[in-house]
Amino acid sequence: MKTLLLTLLVVTIVCLDLGYTLECHNQQSSQAPTTTGCSGGETNCYKKGWRDHRGYRIERGCGCPSVKKGIEINCCTTDRCNN
């Protein structure tokens, strides 16, 4: 019985991957690359781009936000995939 419970515990930990935090780039436009650990079980990184009076702007971070028309967005699900 103890072996069965131990096996179930190990399988649960492996399947849930407890303690895993997605890592996303979070630098803006042409800044040097930086990363951040996402919180709250976030499973996406994003890269958002648009043009304004300063030129083409880029924003990166955790999540996959909704955007207005004219703003490009790319969402992805692996570590540092939004560079």
Curated annotation (Swiss-Prot):
<protein>
    <recommendedName>
        <fullName>Alpha-neurotoxin NTX-4</fullName>
    </recommendedName>
</protein>
<dbReference type="InterPro" id="IPR045860">
    <property type="entry name" value="Snake_toxin-like_sf"/>
</dbReference>
<dbReference type="Pfam" id="PF21947">
    <property type="entry name" value="Toxin_cobra-type"/>
</dbReference>
<dbReference type="GO" id="GO:0005576">
    <property type="term" value="C:extracellular region"/>
</dbReference>
<dbReference type="InterPro" id="IPR054131">
    <property type="entry name" value="Toxin_cobra-type"/>
</dbReference>
<dbReference type="GO" id="GO:0030550">
    <property type="term" value="F:acetylcholine receptor inhibitor activity"/>
</dbReference>
<keyword id="KW-0008">Acetylcholine receptor inhibiting toxin</keyword>
<keyword id="KW-0872">Ion channel impairing toxin</keyword>
<keyword id="KW-0629">Postsynaptic neurotoxin</keyword>
<keyword id="KW-0732">Signal</keyword>
<dbReference type="InterPro" id="IPR018354">
    <property type="entry name" value="Snake_toxin_con_site"/>
</dbReference>
<keyword id="KW-1015">Disulfide bond</keyword>
<feature type="disulfide bond">
    <location>
        <begin position="24"/>
        <end position="45"/>
    </location>
</feature>
<dbReference type="GO" id="GO:0099106">
    <property type="term" value="F:ion channel regulator activity"/>
</dbReference>
<dbReference type="GO" id="GO:0090729">
    <property type="term" value="F:toxin activity"/>
</dbReference>
<comment type="similarity">
    <text>Belongs to the three-finger toxin family. Short-chain subfamily. Type I alpha-neurotoxin sub-subfamily.</text>
</comment>
<feature type="disulfide bond">
    <location>
        <begin position="76"/>
        <end position="81"/>
    </location>
</feature>
<feature type="signal peptide">
    <location>
        <begin position="1"/>
        <end position="21"/>
    </location>
</feature>
<keyword id="KW-0528">Neurotoxin</keyword>
<keyword id="KW-0964">Secreted</keyword>
<dbReference type="InterPro" id="IPR003571">
    <property type="entry name" value="Snake_3FTx"/>
</dbReference>
<feature type="disulfide bond">
    <location>
        <begin position="64"/>
        <end position="75"/>
    </location>
</feature>
<keyword id="KW-0800">Toxin</keyword>
<feature type="disulfide bond">
    <location>
        <begin position="38"/>
        <end position="62"/>
    </location>
</feature>
<comment type="function">
    <text>Binds to muscle nicotinic acetylcholine receptor (nAChR) and inhibit acetylcholine from binding to the receptor, thereby impairing neuromuscular transmission.</text>
</comment>
